Amino acid sequence: MVTGRSAQLCLALLFMSLDVILTATEKSVLTLDPPWIRIFTGEKVTLSCYGNNHLQMNSTTKWIHNGTVSEVNSSHLVIVSATVQDSGKYICQKQGLFKSKPVYLNVTQDWLLLQTSADMVLVHGSFDIRCHGWKNWNVRKVIYYRNDHAFNYSYESPVSIREATLNDSGTYHCKGYLRQVKYESDKFRIAVVKAYKCKYYWLQLIFPLLVAILFAVDTGLLLSTEEQFKSVLEIQKTGKYKKVETELLT
């Protein structure tokens, strides 16, 4: 029979197991500061890796660049003066969490660059674009194009696309003047996609949940059996003492 103490311990173990499972199903989050995934050589960018709470912020971080694990294990990876070799796929992973979604950084050399905060956005999401001049020179009379059609004449930068729709997908570029000379950036594709919903998402949680329940129940039963065994020993010991006392009296 499971005692009250064993039942409480069983529940405590179950909640602890569930907490571990829920934590392990969360992904690390990788961000850029400034937020642009396209930058010029010589520019600075800081990559930061976050967990789901402030305690994980100080935990060990694994950084992976183009499949190679970095020696850096802090929450921030700072690229002081970017080179073309810094281009590529970045992934981070906080201790106890899944790996982050990959971020693709493109480091290039040109006079004018169409910068963007993302190359893929979910419907109803948002992203920013900016027409960026070499060595941070001021860009004047900026025109933004999507699929070769002008859609924004902006003297303010950046331009924010909010509540993105599928119609916002396309190839973007910009034109503008640098020191009285007109330049055109290269083209870059930004995709707006629908969120993918897996019909069997619950299967990702039910198996570890069952394992946690079985672990907690087995532990509770083990402790309950141990307590019952101790009780039997006490009863046997008490019975022996009574038998000895009876023999001494007779």
Curated annotation (Swiss-Prot):
Q: Which residues lie on this side of the membrane: Cytoplasmic?
A: 224-250
One annotated Gene Ontology cellular component of this protein: membrane raft
* Signal sequence, start to end: 1-23
Keywords of the record: Cell membrane, Disulfide bond, Glycoprotein, IgE-binding protein, Immunoglobulin domain, Membrane, Receptor, Repeat, Signal, Transmembrane, Transmembrane helix
Choose any GO biological process term that the UniProt entry carries and state it: serotonin secretion
Q: What is the lineage of its organism?
A: Eukaryota, Metazoa, Chordata, Craniata, Vertebrata
The UniProt entry, under InterPro entries, shows:
Ig-like_dom (IPR007110), Ig-like_dom_sf (IPR036179), Ig-like_fold (IPR013783), Ig_Fc_receptor (IPR050488), Ig_sub (IPR003599)
> What inducers act on this gene?
Exhibits night/day variations with an increased expression at night in the pineal gland.
Q: Which GO terms describe its molecular function?
A: IgE binding; IgE receptor activity
Name-wise, this protein is: High affinity immunoglobulin epsilon receptor subunit alpha
What's the subunit arrangement here? Tetramer of an alpha chain, a beta chain, and two disulfide linked gamma chains. Interacts with IGHE (via CH3 region).
The residues that the database entry marks as glycosylated are: 58, 66, 73, 106, 152, 167
**Free-text function comment from the UniProt entry:** High-affinity receptor for immunoglobulin epsilon/IgE. Mediates IgE effector functions in myeloid cells. Upon IgE binding and antigen/allergen cross-linking initiates signaling pathways that lead to myeloid cell activation and differentiation. On mast cells, basophils and eosinophils stimulates the secretion of vasoactive amines, lipid mediators and cytokines that contribute to inflammatory response, tissue remodeling and cytotoxicity against microbes.
